[in-house]
Amino acid sequence: MDSSNDEVLFVGTAEDEHVEMYLKAIWHIKERNESVKISTIARMLSVKQPSVVQMLKKLNQQQLVEYNKAGVFLTENGEKVGSHMMRNSRLMEVLMVSALKVEINEEMVCGIEHHMNKQFTNALCIMLNHPRKCPHNHTIPKGECCEKN
């Protein structure tokens, strides 16, 4: 069997997706100008508050958030990941509604957004003509491809 023709399958880690979901949730709460509370994150992600605390401690160690008695704040790197995830999500929603003419399926969007690299995201943004708002009328964070326009 010629191994050069074998299909290579990518298996992402659930841990990476959990990290991205937490950062996206925090980014979204911040976008709404609300203070980031453990209870709000738990409600958004349908998890228990102790799980949120455990993940925030992990994100704090990874320097993606600052988590202390003063609250929860995204670091510069955490902000980048959260913004990137929100951009992916909202561009996928625009693709579904505007280009594919299908109803938004949040479960599908969530499954895809974690696997979109910068090249794919920028190509999608260009194809969609750099949309500024998603179908829910939320701002889509700009990417490098938008800065050139």
Residue ranges and their predicted role:
Residues 111-149:
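C-terminal regulatory/oligomerization modules of transcriptional regulators
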Residues 1-24:
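Short alpha-helical segments that sit at the start of domains
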Residues 32-42:
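Short acidic, hydrophobic short linear motifs in intrinsically disordered regions
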Residues 56-57:
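Short, hydrophobic-biased segments on the C-terminal half of alpha helices
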Residues 50:
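Key DNA-contact positions within bacterial/archaeal DNA-binding proteins
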Residues 70-88:
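Basic, amphipathic "hinge/linker" alpha-helix immediately C-terminal to the N-terminal HTH DNA-binding motif
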